[in-house]
Amino acid sequence: MLRVAVPNKGTLAGPASEMLAEAGYRQRHEQRDLTVLDPVNDVEFFFLRPKDIAIYVGSGELDLGITGRDLALDSGSPVDERLALGFGGSNFRYAAPAEAGEWSVGDLAGRRIATSYPRLVTDDLARYGVSADVIRLDGAVEISIQLGVADAIADVVGSGRTLRQHSLVAFGEPICSSEAVVIERRGSDQQEAKDRLVARLQGVVFAQQYVMLDYNCPRDLLDEAAKLTPGLGSPTMSPLADEKWVAVRAMVSRKEAPAIMDRLADFGAKAILSSDIRSCRM
């Protein structure tokens, strides 16, 4: 039986469970449930702290896990990233008091840096050849400067609102660009079962990025239509009762779909329909 770790709380928990459900896997109904058995798919899910998931997977106790890329890297566990899931995006960056003027990574030499990700910070500082005092805190690192514990911080930055609230400004290149990812232990067993789960999730990710367009097109404009909606290789075309028209079906980028529909209508396409895709295999 495949054993899979899922975040039990935080911003990754809800989307991760929803994506697994879309992929056809049973998920928990009560927040207090720590495990869920899915006998149909021969999978057992374990709901764990996101920060611990890479450790469990890396130790070989679990086969796969969903966690943040930043958490997996900071754990130092022997895990590999199998699939980026497209949610929970953030950047991990240095930040310092705005009143101190412009900072660079070099200015951190000899300074105290508070962070919940000491391994990531230590590795990044080494890349720049900078020696600093890295102070590990479990959360709310923004307040550490005000309390005199640190001179700068390194933390996950989303909208930047929290930094602004504490009069901090981010500087330097992102230490890590993170999102939710599927991880596995290097050299672990059950490869076929793991590949199947990853393929299902990949189908959901892909479906979220595309829509299906159906429309009727004048036969003499098919070449132009095919350029607009090439699909994933070639659009599907079917004859209609009126020989001057052809039905066309193609997958297009969800973001680009409205503009493509406008252009199709402009050159004479009719009955243009956009529909969501639940899942797919490519």
From Swiss-Prot:
This is ATP phosphoribosyltransferase. Pathway: Amino-acid biosynthesis; L-histidine biosynthesis; L-histidine from 5-phospho-alpha-D-ribose 1-diphosphate: step 1/9. It is found in: Cytoplasm. The gene is hisG. It is an enzyme of class 2 (transferase). One of its GO terms (biological process) is L-histidine biosynthetic process. It comes from the Bacteria. PROSITE patterns: ATP_P_PHORIBOSYLTR (PS01316).
